[in-house]
């Protein structure tokens, strides 16, 4: 029977949904205020919704209910689930394990797996990706990426390195460049013989 004068029915509350407040998902209409996960009641949008038949869920709840189960099928980083699967008729057997120390027993094993944070040669502190500038084959903080003599801020186009230190081209030429007549000025007095 046709629905005269009214809009579609909301998939959550079954009341009429008018066009101005309508969100469509999986062929069904919802009020904007009813577009919540049917398990945890979290507000949903087009990027966080996962539909199963006539029900809508957030991606985490959808994965818990309808995703693969068992060892090796975690919900991803940041999610901790203590669900044993009893509501699905699964038997969970936990084997006793010896207590382990929380601290890393072998730091070299940890650094081999996750990598050690790189250290800035100038200040000795860790250099993270957001502040990392490469110079002389080493990572530097943006604030430490300066000439060792004049303190001028450096860029990849005007940096030179010597013995693990960074210099601007001018300071490098003055201190380590060629010397003598024709190389940036006189470095020795030439005596005239009369």
Curated annotation (Swiss-Prot):
Mutagenesis / variant outcome for changing residue 69 to R: Increases PKC/PRKCA activity
Role of this protein: Positive regulator of myogenesis. Acts as a cofactor for myogenic bHLH transcription factors such as MYOD1, and probably MYOG and MYF6. Enhances the DNA-binding activity of the MYOD1:TCF3 isoform E47 complex and may promote formation of a functional MYOD1:TCF3 isoform E47:MEF2A complex involved in myogenesis. Plays a crucial and specific role in the organization of cytosolic structures in cardiomyocytes. Could play a role in mechanical stretch sensing. May be a scaffold protein that promotes the assembly of interacting proteins at Z-line structures.
Localization in the cell: Nucleus; Cytoplasm; Cytoplasm, Cytoskeleton; Cytoplasm, Myofibril, Sarcomere, Z line
Domain notes: LIM zinc-binding domain 1 is required for self-association. LIM zinc-binding domain 1 and LIM zinc-binding domain 2 both are required for optimal actin-bundling activity. LIM zinc-binding domain 1 mediates binding to MYOD1. LIM zinc-binding domain 2 mediates binding to SPTB.
Annotated spans, Interaction with TCAP: 1-5
Short motif Nuclear localization signal, span: 64-69
GO cellular component: cytoplasm; cytoskeleton; cytosol; nucleoplasm; nucleus; Z disc
Keywords: Actin-binding, Cardiomyopathy, Cytoplasm, Cytoskeleton, Developmental protein, Differentiation, Disease variant, LIM domain, Metal-binding, Myogenesis, Nucleus, Phosphoprotein, Repeat, Transcription, Transcription regulation, Zinc
Residues found modified as Phosphoserine: 95, 153
GO molecular function: actin binding; actinin binding; identical protein binding; metal ion binding; structural constituent of muscle; telethonin binding
Every LIM zinc-binding domain range: 10-61, 120-171
Region of interest: Interaction with CLF2 and isoform 2: 94-105
InterPro entries on file: Znf_LIM
Organs and tissues of expression: Cardiac and slow-twitch skeletal muscles. Isoform 2 is expressed in striated muscle. Isoform 2 is specifically expressed at higher levels in patients with neuromuscular diseases, such as limb-girdle muscular dystrophy 2A (LGMD2A), Duchenne muscular dystrophy (DMD) and dermatomyositis.
PANTHER family: CYSTEINE AND GLYCINE-RICH PROTEIN 3, RHO-GTPASE-ACTIVATING PROTEIN LRG1
Effect of residue 72 to R: In CMD1M; uncertain significance; increases PKC/PRKCA activity
Record's keyword annotation contains Phosphoprotein: yes
Descriptive protein name: Cysteine and glycine-rich protein 3
Reported disease: Cardiomyopathy, dilated, 1M: A disorder characterized by ventricular dilation and impaired systolic function, resulting in congestive heart failure and arrhythmia. Patients are at risk of premature death.
A Pfam family recorded for this sequence: LIM
One GO biological process term: negative regulation of myoblast differentiation
Organism annotation: Homo sapiens
Predominant place of localization: nucleus
């Amino acid at each position: 029977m046709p629905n005269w004068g009214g809009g579609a029915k909301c998939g959550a509350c079954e009341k009429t949904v008018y066009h101005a407040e309508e969100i469509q998902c999986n062929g069904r209409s919802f009020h904007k205020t009813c577009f919540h996960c049917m398990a945890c009641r979290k507000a949903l949008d087009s990027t966080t919704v996962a539909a199963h038949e006539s029900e809508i869920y957030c991606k985490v709840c959808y994965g818990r209910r309808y995703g693969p189960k068992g060892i090796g099928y975690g919900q991803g980083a940041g999610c901790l689930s203590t669900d044993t699967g009893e509501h699905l008729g699964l038997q969970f057997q936990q084997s006793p394990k010896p207590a382990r120390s929380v601290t890393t027993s072998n730091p070299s094993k940890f650094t081999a797996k996750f990598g050690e944070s790189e250290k800035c040669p100038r200040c000795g502190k860790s250099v993270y990706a957001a502040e990392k500038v490469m110079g002389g084959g080493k990572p530097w903080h943006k604030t430490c990426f300066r000439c060792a003599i004049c303190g001028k801020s450096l860029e990849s186009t005007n940096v030179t390195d010597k013995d693990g230190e960074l210099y601007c081209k001018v300071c490098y030429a003055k201190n380590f460049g060629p010397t003598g007549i024709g190389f940036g000025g006189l470095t020795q007095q030439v005596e005239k013989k009369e």
